[in-house]
Amino acid sequence: MLVPWAPIAATSVVAAAASSYYFSNMAISNDAKTATLKGDDQWVDLKLKSSKDLSHNTKALIFELPTPDSTLGLTTASALLTKYVTPKGSNVVRPYTPVSDPDSKGEFELVVKSYPEGKMSKHIHELKEGDTLSFKGPIIKYQWQPNLHKEITLIGAGTGITPLYQLISAINKNPEDKTKVNLFYGNATEGDILLKDEIDAIAKAKPQQFNVHYFLDKPSDNWKGENGFISEEFIKGNSPAADSDNVKVFVCGPPPFYKAISGAKVSPTDQGEVDGALKNLGFNKDQVFKF
């Protein structure tokens, strides 16, 4: 089975409908006193400190927290909501996953890809230094526990790398966490690969623990990674089988990617049935998590 790349899109309707679930399942940081987002359903306006282009349509943005000692208030594998009000008075709400360390103080980082029809992503890309954006959260996604799984597989595409990178970063940061990680990450071109320097540095420092494969749909002549889409055969040959002990697979990407790899989520509270490549390989609902 071949897996297509496509833009990740989230609608304000979905974000709003999920709000009651999200905020009844909060991931509060260990130090609640310094947390900026406290899980109380209150929007907090934060100022853009700086931004830089990562590619022709992707930016890294640093937002200031209220004080130099403030933390954002998220834990590993959690996210937040962003909001802005249009000139006509409509609320636009979208979820994003920060890529900075949850324990970072004074600021945090988002990586945002702009899509032609993406109201929030276009708005964020137009922000200037000193402009503010409203945030709320945190949103729990998955409660990571070190060493719960001997080995995990992360399968992502496009900006779907952000929650997967959170897991990679947390495992790398914790010397007691010996979880082995396989990352299969697909994009259209080399310029679309996000966080590559950070991921490569981790894999180079701990090659026995972090196994990374990049896939390009449109590789250049000198590309040394994998060509084409993430195939069922590649997953089978480069990660633990479904009958392995305590196996876990994490998936994040656009809707066509979910459909091909794992099957779609039904709602924020319902992971849906496992379908696609992972179903064909024998994985069940307990073994697969869809961000």
UniProtKB/Swiss-Prot annotation:
This is NADH-cytochrome b5 reductase 2. Keywords: FAD, Flavoprotein, Membrane, Mitochondrion, Mitochondrion outer membrane, NAD, Oxidoreductase, Transmembrane, Transmembrane helix. GO terms for cellular component: mitochondrial intermembrane space; mitochondrial outer membrane. GO terms for biological process: cellular response to oxidative stress; ergosterol biosynthetic process. Its cofactor is FAD. The chain crosses the membrane at residues 7-23. Its main location: mitochondrion. It is a single-pass membrane protein. PANTHER family: NADH-CYTOCHROME B5 REDUCTASE (PTHR19370), NADH-CYTOCHROME B5 REDUCTASE 2 (PTHR19370:SF171). Gene3D superfamilies: Nucleotide-binding domain of ferredoxin-NADP reductase (FNR) module (3.40.50.80), Translation factors (2.40.30.10). May mediate the reduction of outer membrane cytochrome b5. PROSITE patterns: FAD_FR. It is found in: Mitochondrion outer membrane. It is an enzyme of class 1 (oxidoreductase). Coiled coil: none annotated.
